[in-house]
Amino acid sequence: MLAKGYTATSVDEICTAAGLTKGSFFHYFEGKEHLGRLVAERFYATRKQLFALAPFHQKKDPLERVLGRVDFFIEMSRGPHPPKGCLLGTFVQELYATHPAIRSVCADCFADSARGFQQDLEEAKATHAPRARWSAQSLSEHLTAILQGALILAKAKQDPKVIRESLGHFRDYLRSLFRE
């Protein structure tokens, strides 16, 4: 589904790739949309587990955790297999108007992802920029927007460097917010 998109991937292709009969597919899933919801949830759960192991969580200073989170995403784009995209972002772009149940699952995953960053931002703000007027909630969603946009642009340009550059700009922006 990540390679071709939800709409272009047929149940027959899913069954062939999984080595299942159509009968087996429909025994376990109500239909393709049910599978789509479960795939989105599984994709996010897998990413969340990977993310939970990131070293920045060990940092005592919340500002270092904030910057470390961005650095973690930058490093992920340098790996031997840079991200080819985000299934959640792909699903939302393709299905937001036609499959509200899948869109809702993706929105919940994005919100959950932003919550951890928001908490670190709130702690960093209280410690390092108590008079700042920016919203930790809005800024945490801004990271999602930048990351999703960078993934799309990296695909369009076929160059993961775009991800590093976009996140590097965001990191610089964050540092400037804490210097005000």
Residue spans of the language-model regions?
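Amphipathic C-terminal alpha-helical segment
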Residues: 76, 123, 144-161, 173-180
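Amphipathic alpha-helical segments used for helix-helix packing
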Residues: 65, 80-101
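Short coil/turn segments at alpha/beta junctions that flank glycine-rich nucleotide-binding fingerprints
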Residues: 3-7, 58, 84, 127
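Alpha-helical structural segments
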Residues: 3, 17, 34-57, 64-79, ...
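Hydrophobic alpha-helical bundle segments that form small-molecule/ligand-binding pockets
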Residues: 98-102, 111-139, 176-180
